[in-house]
Amino acid sequence: MFESLPITVLDECEGQTNLGDNHEIVSFNLDVLGKPVHLQVGVKDKQARLADIVPAARVLSSRIVETTMKRLQDIGASVPCHKGCAACCTYHLVSISVPEVFRLVQETTMMPLERCGDIVDSCSKVAKRINRYLVKRIAFKKLTNTETNSQVLAFEIHGEELEKLSDWYIKQKLPCPFLCNGLCTIYEQRPATCREHLVVGTAPCQFDKDDAERKMKVPIRPIRMIDALKLLASDLEGTTQESIPLLCAFDWYRGNIQRSNRTWSALTIAERFIGIVRAMISQSNRMRAEQVKYVSKEGTRS
């Protein structure tokens, strides 16, 4: 199995024996909130797609989340988030990066046919509602997909408009189509935004979902993996940084099939990704150090 994958996350106990020939091991350490986070990646001497970096990004994201949760618990904060809690999944508008879209489509098509069809249909129905909402609020354009000759709605939303869309979405009370009996059917493959969404509080975050203005206590994260993946795709493809609402992923993909098949050397993708993550973590650490320095200085003055 290892030999067929261009980029593979390795456990600490795994050596180079499982990777076959023509490979390179890339290891790096990160300082996350003062704690070491290590990742070791096996990279084959072959071409890779953007989707191939996503498993490594997921593992790294989970390790950073674990470190963040431990740090919060060390200072006495309560983090009620756990596997099986779907409180946020029933209202939160999740955005994902281009590499995650491509990987999600691959993994969804490997599900049982009926389940795959249900998910795609559910997403498409909500995507149409989102598009109708956006048509009323935001300038948009139609793109023709040369492969299917279908019309694909392309849009970019940021800042205030994204907040308005999120508030509108909350009021629709739409559960994530990947939920089944309250459980995430793609939990191990869930988007970085989902795995990094933590809530700090003294009780589980069940609340009245009619209250779109409610603001939960969300801790500052050392890094948002979606930002790293957005920058990676933008860097490699020469495009603007893009994020796509999860529920629009399949519709968006149909207009970008050719992009999903573009390849680069696996080593290029892995090294670019690692470089981006390192830079983001370093910037986060510098900002944290400046905040500590500022608080300390203000305390001395008082």
Positions of the model-derived regions?
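Short loop/turn segments that flank or connect secondary-structure elements
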Residues: 1-302
